[in-house]
Amino acid sequence: MQKITVLCVGKLKEAFYEQAVKEYEKRLSRCCKLELLELPEQRPGDEPSEAEIRQALKKEAALVEQKLPKGGALIAMCIEGQELSSVALSQKMQQLAARGASQLTFLIGSSFGLDEDLKKKADLRLSMSPMTFPHHLARVMLLEQIYRAYQIEAGTKYHK
């Protein structure tokens, strides 16, 4: 069974997001070994400068580096990433597994995004949409898409 790690910078605060995450955790438990990791968001202040934002992202990146699993493939969720259909994501996950990536790590940054060096280390940069979403909602959307990818691979009726 493939291992999926979803590493998120920032804690879920709203109960409705937590409920949705729990639902997809339950569904995914039949498809993969899922690990959800949360790291604290660095808050640079109310009206931070670009330099303060970069510094906060560097601090977050250092925390992320400590928690990144060894081996496997790293998928950075970022707005400038590649947009894939659900079917294409399923195929990409299968391709990575076929190339020996027994573990996939999806990385969701804080409200300021991800440090550039982390993005460069990624095997794939993935964008959900050209639209902007709260990173808490992105977590739910990503879990749903991972679940959908497994259902596509299995040929179930979930994906229509």
Residue ranges of predicted features:
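N-terminal beta1-alpha1 ligand-phosphate binding loop
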Residues: 1-28
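Short hydrophobic segments within beta-strands
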Residues: 7-9, 37-39, 77, 107
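Short glycine-rich anion-binding loops that position phosphate/pyrophosphate groups of nucleotides
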Residues: 12, 79-82, 110-113
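Conserved strand-to-helix beginnings and helix N-cap segments that scaffold or border functional pockets
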Residues: 17-21, 86-90, 119, 139
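Conserved beta-strand segments of alpha/beta enzyme cores
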Residues: 33-35, 124
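Structured adenosyl-cofactor binding patch, chiefly the S-adenosyl-L-methionine
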Residues: 112, 116-160
